[in-house]
């Protein structure tokens, strides 16, 4: 617990990807999101592909990572569809692509599809020297499924495993983050996301192994007394 009290607000801010992914998102809200990211020195912003141009116009050259989502939020679109979506995101200038695992394929034990898709998308993203995060939707996965997902992530050499979309099932929790940290290779990082609304939870997740925090309540989190 000492770690929680030692981390400064500035240090916490450097972990946060300020996120807006709701379906009725407006351009004004994206602009506010980006301005807040600059004001509070957040690590990145996460927005839908549709809003990438708007985010890049504001944040280009600031050092704030531009993050978007692929196959969001259910992950069951085809690999070809995800590939084309990822290509567009890269063309528009995204730095990080957060890709939802094919949850339906996992639940039907179609691990060949899961593995082939992750490998294909990882090669595409890495060919452009960008970052891929695999959204594992941990709250919907059994221990066995999560173990297999971590093995595929290790073999495919994704950059991050991300805990949740924030849409399906429970969000991030300390126990799960600590567990996947043990299963992942040391060079694969973790993004905790989903239901993170307080500074204390964010710090506990970082202590458990999270390298980034995805949150929509970021400003309230870092300004709470």
How would you describe each model-predicted region?
Residues 1-6:
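Short, Lys/Arg-enriched N-terminal segments with co-localized hydrophobic residues
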Residues 9-40, 52-57, 64, 69, ...:
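Alpha/beta enzyme core
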Residues 43-51:
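N-terminal low-complexity or amphipathic/hydrophobic leaders
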Residues 74-81, 222-225:
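Short, charged, surface-exposed secondary-structure boundary motifs
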Residues 191-195:
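Short glycine/threonine-rich catalytic loop with a Thr-x-Gly-x-Asp
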């Amino acid at each position: 617990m000492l770690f929680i009290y030692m981390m400064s607000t500035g240090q916490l801010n450097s972990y946060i990807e300020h996120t807006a992914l709701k379906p009725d998102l407006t351009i004004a809200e994206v602009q506010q999101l980006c301005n807040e990211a600059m004001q509070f020195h957040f690590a990145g912003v996460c927005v839908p592909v549709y809003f990438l141009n708007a985010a890049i116009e504001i944040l280009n050259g600031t050092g704030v990572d531009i993050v978007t989502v692929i196959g969001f939020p259910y992950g069951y679109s085809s690999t070809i569809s995800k590939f084309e979506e990822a290509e567009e995101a890269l063309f528009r200038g995204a730095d990080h692509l957060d890709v939802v695992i094919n949850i339906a394929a996992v639940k039907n034990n179609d691990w060949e599809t899961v593995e082939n898709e992750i490998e294909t998308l990882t090669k595409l993203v890495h060919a452009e020297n960008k970052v891929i995060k695999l959204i594992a939707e941990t709250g919907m996965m059994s221990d066995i499924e999560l173990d297999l997902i971590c093995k595929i992530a290790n073999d495919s050499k994704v950059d991050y495993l991300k805990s949740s979309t924030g849409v399906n099932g429970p969000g991030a929790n300390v126990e799960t983050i600590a567990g996947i940290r043990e299963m992942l290779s040391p060079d694969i990082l973790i993004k905790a996301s989903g239901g993170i609304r307080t500074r204390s939870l964010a710090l506990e997740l970082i202590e458990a192994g999270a390298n980034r925090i995805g949150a929509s309540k970021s400003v309230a989190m870092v300004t709470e007394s």
